[in-house]
Amino acid sequence: MKKRHLLIAGLACMTILGACNNDDAGSSGQAVVEVDGHEISDAEFVDMLKERYGEAILQELVQRHLISQAADSVEIPQEEIDEELETFKSQIGVETDDEMLDALSNQFGITVENKEEFVNEYILPPLVLEKLAVEGVEITDEEKQAYFDENRDSLIEVEASHILVEDEETAEEVLDRLEAGDDFAELASEYSVDPSAEANNGDLGFFGKGDMVPEFEEAAFNMEIDEVSEPVESTYGYHIILVTDRKDSYEELEEKIHDTLMRERSRTQEEVLRDLLAQADINVLDDQFEGLFDLPDAPPVEDTPEIDGEDASDEAEDQAEDADENAEEEDES
């Protein structure tokens, strides 16, 4: 989701901020580097950072403060926080908290004391924005039922596993072994050329229409539960498909419908931030950043010419007369 992009962007931005936030920067004139006898001071270094990246960093700091204030009115379940933390670890290729803290320091130049500090600074803000985005949005049972009735066919989901092989001969060999009673998951691990098969034994989980290549989708959505397909050819090779479950009732799809309607009706995170900025009292004290937080004025509403009842009648009569005259001219011609 977008919040994950926001998290990575925030880390990158705060990497720059770390250089600007040095306790001695800009005050002592201490040299950062010496080149052929010429010293480049930390003041020069920070001034250039401010010139080039100052607006982005200042916006980030203000936004983080506003989100922190707004967090007081938002309740986020611990399981959501834990899920986001695990997702972030996966994104940067680590498993433990210590590995994550090391990666933050080595990859992003971010030093935090512990996991809790990282969660408060980087995991919570996107979650707060997400909660604010759906604030006040309500979906009724009647609306969900109506959406289901109108979009039933496109909402259906199928759960399936597959064994992908390169040629039809191998596919027939796999089918023979399945008919002989061999286990589908074990055969997927043995035969499938799908890179994910080693980890998931061919299990694709639930998917909807449009998620798979057309040939695969056509076969899977027309199969019964526990049915095994004949070889299905696609651009990837030959698939042996096993359908294991299906969601096609309102009760099974209600959560998906609810999430879809929430996404359609909620504000974007950009809109949430814009609203927070509009409500805040921001006084820019540095001339370099004057106007940075000014919000664009709403476009003026164009006045619609008013026609009172009498004028409207006159105009209608004129149009009718013009139409009659045109008709008479056509008859004469």
Curated annotation (Swiss-Prot):
Does this UniProt record's set of keywords contain Transmembrane?
no
**What does the record say about its membrane topology?**
Lipid-anchor
Q: Where is the signal peptide?
A: 1-19
Q: Which UniProt keywords apply?
A: Cell membrane, Isomerase, Lipoprotein, Membrane, Palmitate, Rotamase, Signal
Q: Which GO terms describe its biological process?
A: protein folding
Q: Where is the composition biased (Acidic residues)?
A: 303-333
Tell me which residues make up the PpiC domain: 155-245
Top class in the EC scheme: isomerase
Catalysed conversion reaction: [protein]-peptidylproline (omega=180) = [protein]-peptidylproline (omega=0)
Region feature (Disordered) = 291-333
Assign the protein's first listed, main location to one coarse class: membrane
Task: Give the Gene Ontology MF terms in alphabetical order.
Answer: peptidyl-prolyl cis-trans isomerase activity
| Similarity section | Belongs to the PrsA family.
Name assigned to this protein = Foldase protein PrsA
Q: Which organism is it from?
A: Halalkalibacterium halodurans (strain ATCC BAA-125 / DSM 18197 / FERM 7344 / JCM 9153 / C-125)
Q: What is the lineage of its organism?
A: Bacteria, Bacillati, Bacillota, Bacilli, Bacillales
Which gene is annotated as encoding this protein in its UniProt record?
A: prsA
